[in-house]
């Protein structure tokens, strides 16, 4: 049979929302989204036709992981136009929670290549079998005020606050403002004869942004690995041993 590699992944995407309009100028929208993935990866090297398989008398692995991401958004919007003035005010919140878990097991020493599941393995790997899990969350609050006069002169101000579980509790939150202004030149009277220009706008702005990409889920904490020994063979105790595998990232901890 040789090498057998199998991968199966299932994904569930679900979303629901509620839209409330107390009066024409005011709208409230609430949205809940679920994104769940389950993946299974299995391998089998038979004990006969492959060199590595013959060396291990057959080898198999089973790796599984599940990731669930929940997002809950709430947005309140107010729009009002009066004469040549236009005003939009928006405020909202966003919450995201991610839960990840995985497990892996490897076995060897098969009597034949007919049964490839791990329950037919006569030896389970001690150092290549285990489980893992991680979780992170982020909470955000945001708002925007936009004003325009005659659809020609526009100003916008934004403010956003984000709090991430990946950062130390003492400096977990960040506030990010932004401002912009625009002039729609094509709407001015002196542009009326320039029919070859449909829309011409001059815009400038300034803002700050933040992100948590590249930061580990527990980067500000001391982390440990758990090691196991075959105590029943060596005559030792059956206690697991733990040792540090990574120091916390200094820029993410409270000093």
Residue spans of the language-model regions?
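Short amphipathic helix-turn modules centered on a small-residue break
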Residues: 47-49
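Extracellular/periplasmic, surface-exposed regions of secreted and cell-surface proteins
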Residues: 1-45, 54-253
